[in-house]
């Protein structure tokens, strides 16, 4: 819900939401407002399988977002160049540009979803459980990629996750919510080392320790 409010898909019923100094408490009512917000804030969904149009080639996925949010009017050749530039940024070489989503693995699809978001050159990317559907080894690759992109492009992330190990790896600051209320917040490393709220302590205690193995039944 918080993510949907930030991108303008939900109206705030109490309190305020501010993005880059601008009040975003009201849902975007007009197409122009939605485009302005989308240029500022892009969204990467949890499911890399349903978030892409299965009939649209990867190059077209990226180019459509480039075309929608470009401040100039790039021609076909320039759009192709920019699309490949964005795909290069997420580690997908030229051979992927003509492929369909069904030809890609889950990790590759999520790279495409990240590239689609970056095509708008946003200030903020909302990642809603963006690695939860991926294998652990692929999760690590995507998290490392996101860290590199953040450093290179100076983009901020709102990373929504229930996995504290993932949160610890990707975030600088952490907010803990319980039943829609903020119950804890602060520097991620400090908060995980010394949680103050009972709910945060319970979350931390639920994380398996090193060498953990499931019990046999």
PLM features: residue spans?
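Helix-to-loop junction immediately C-terminal to a conserved catalytic motif
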Residues: 7
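Conserved ABC ATPase "signature" region
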Residues: 77-95, 204-205
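Conserved ABC ATPase signature
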Residues: 100-104, 108
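A short, surface-exposed alpha-helical micro-motif characterized by mixed small hydrophobic
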Residues: 167-169
